[in-house]
Amino acid sequence: MNQFEQFQSALELTKVSDTVFSFTPDSRYFVGNTPHGGYLLALMNKALTSMLPHPCAINSNVYYLDRTEPEPAELHVEIIRTSRGSSMGQVKLIQNEKITCLYSSLSSDFQYMKGHSGLATPLPEIMNSVSRDNFKVMNYENFKLGSTPSFIQQLDMSVHPDHAWWDRELSTDHADARCSAYLELQGGVADTFVLSYLSDILPPVVQNKYGPLGWIPTLALTCNIRQLPQTKQLFIDGLAKDISNGYFEQDCNIWDMDGNLVATSRQLAKILKSEEKISS
């Protein structure tokens, strides 16, 4: 089973009733002992779009309200509105009688979309600032044995050498809170579920400036899927900014190799004990 097929199998849902699905999180898509946020986003995306007349979640918003445990859970789906061109609904991820994630999404169908296109966002210059061969596989084993998250190990990810904080000397004065990387799930071209997963694929990019900061939970995530990619390999560019009282925003753009912007995301995350960890 290739990487693409493995991911699709990890999204398996069991229909419990007309509006409820059950699933067991796949440990290959975990951060430590917790399901990865982008993986949960993909699961909720699949549950909702399976019930809507439009198959493509063009805008998704999820609030991570509490920890999702590595055990069976349910997805409770509510359809809010359907129309000719789009539809909307929400999903509650419920585990042990507690809502751990709240998801809402607007869906449409790329096959039938029409309208003007312009104001394109080009691939970033940093992509070509060094040879592709100089990008480094994201692997923290040289930094700390066993520290590479399992969700990172399920795809090919090569990071710009300036952003490989685990494999260079840290310089908070000169390093950016940024990560640029080539991405690919071998075996298929990314669909909307894979793009949901990849929208949260980058570990917190503040680490490129400050080094390892421990657990940095994502509190809210917005993902916009702009179009389906035409190439298997993708390029992602993530940038963090405006740390305030430990909270910061992280913005990501994802392109295919033809230069098409296929997805964007923005998340709000929190550095726990940030004053202590960054200033020490």
Region spans (language model):
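Terminal targeting signals and extreme-terminal segments of soluble enzymes
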Residues: 1-280
